[in-house]
A protein has these predicted regions:
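Conserved structural motif at the start of ABC-family nucleotide-binding domains
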Residues: 2, 17-19
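The feature captures the beta-strand-to-loop junction immediately N-terminal to the Walker
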Residues: 33-35
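Helix-to-loop junction immediately C-terminal to a conserved catalytic motif
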Residues: 48
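Conserved ABC transporter NBD signature motif
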Residues: 56-71
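Q-loop/switch helix immediately C-terminal to the Walker
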Residues: 81, 87-101
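Conserved ABC ATPase "signature" region
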Residues: 95, 106-122
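A short, proline-enriched helix->beta-strand linker immediately N-terminal to the Walker B motif
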Residues: 144-148
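Catalytic Walker B motif of ABC-type/P-loop ATPase nucleotide-binding domains
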Residues: 150-154
Length: 182
């Protein structure tokens, strides 16, 4: 279970949100909705451990983020367009990320690229990617290590109709797995 209890966050003296209490359950679609600038991305960053709450606690599977562990574990994360190296290819970027945990092979990465229709462009330099191609690469980096938690901030942005359907199908399959969070 992922939960926030009494979580408040401010930035430069401006309160973003106050006393948030929410629980996300496994094997369900969990959404955070709100108008632009309401703090949705900030809330996701708190769950990941990229930012610390002013008050309250964030727990993921009984671990307090910032206390028991600094960052969320076994999670695929796509928040606010992660930057990639412009002069590396899409595959080069994914392989650099894969070196961190060493749990996914080049062939497995390629299969995700194929799934999202990026296989023909995977060796192009990232700086030549369209917005849709960049979004596909972001999604692939989030899912390629088969996490049991996916934290996605506006994952359908810039995707064409076919890629949106592929993503929808992937996510539907993902949440059917035992103890998976979306």
């Amino acid at each position: 279970m992922i939960s926030l209890k009494g979580v408040s966050k401010s930035y430069k003296g401006i309160t973003i949100f106050e006393d948030v209490n929410i629980t996300f359950m496994p094997n369900k679609w969990n959404f955070i909705e709100g108008v632009n600038g309401s703090g949705k991305s900030v809330l996701l960053k708190l769950i990941c451990g990229f930012s610390k709450p002013d008050t309250g606690i964030v727990t993921v599977d009984d671990y307090v983020i910032g206390q028991d562990c600094d960052f969320i574990q076994n999670a695929g994360i796509c928040i606010n367009s992660p930057d990639f190296f412009n002069n590396l290819s899409g595959m080069g970027n994914l392989l650099e990320i894969a070196k961190i945990k060493k749990i996914v092979t080049k062939n497995e990465i390629y299969q995700f690229c194929k799934l999202f229709g990026l296989e023909e462009d995977i060796n192009k330099k990232y700086k030549y990617y369209s917005l849709g191609m960049k979004q596909k690469l972001r999604i692939i980096q989030a899912i390629m290590e088969s996490p049991n938690i996916l934290i996605l901030d506006e994952p359908f942005d810039a995707l064409d109709k076919q890629a949106k359907q592929i993503m929808q199908n992937y996510l539907n399959d993902f949440i059917k797995k035992e103890n998976h969070y979306l």
